[in-house]
Amino acid sequence: MSAARESHPHGVKRSASPDDDLGSSNWEAADLGNEERKQKFLRLMGAGKKEHTGRLVIGDHKSTSHFRTGEEDKKINEELESQYQQSMDSKLSGRYRRHCGLGFSEVEDHDGEGDVAGDDDDDDDDSPDPESPDDSESDSESEKEESAEELQAAEHPDEVEDPKNKKDAKSNYKMMFVKSSGS
């Protein structure tokens, strides 16, 4: 083995042989036949550009070569900015983020905006931490059931509270949300 090391010393570069220039790495010099086959080979190798053979070149058609005027540009930009601003306002307000479930519609305030979580001024609890959305939904359902019972009692003050009537009122109230609004 020491004889092999002496004939090829470590760290000495070999000179390039003249047959490396025509080796397998030089595919440009390969004889591929006619020009069409050469172009196909280059295209398949990713080196050649395919010529456009379609009838319609993008941007050359008369209907697509319409340029906008300055007024149209301004109008389009204003519309886009207003749409962007509206979407950012609704996203930041968080009004549409809450999942309310099927058949639920928020009660409209006197100024036309829906009730947003955290804006209730008539709450009497002084809890410092805000409720999670799941807690507020379950609380709102129990509040709805209680308000339905109160409405039932207000409509029929002379009736004695019967557990059966109470159960019927709850089921009727729940059925209002189950039934489709489009009858």
Curated annotation (Swiss-Prot):
UniProt xrefs under InterPro entries: SMAP (IPR026714), SMAP_dom (IPR028124)
Keyword Acetylation on entry: yes
Biased composition (Acidic residues): 106-149
Sites bearing N6-acetyllysine, chain numbering: 174, 179
Keywords assigned by UniProt, alphabetized: Acetylation, Isopeptide bond, Phosphoprotein, Ubl conjugation
Region described as Disordered: spans on this chain: 1-183
Biased composition (Basic and acidic residues): 48-78, 153-171
Protein name (Swiss-Prot/TrEMBL): Small acidic protein
Organism: Homo sapiens
Phylogenetic classification of the source organism: Eukaryota, Metazoa, Chordata, Craniata, Vertebrata
Gene label: SMAP
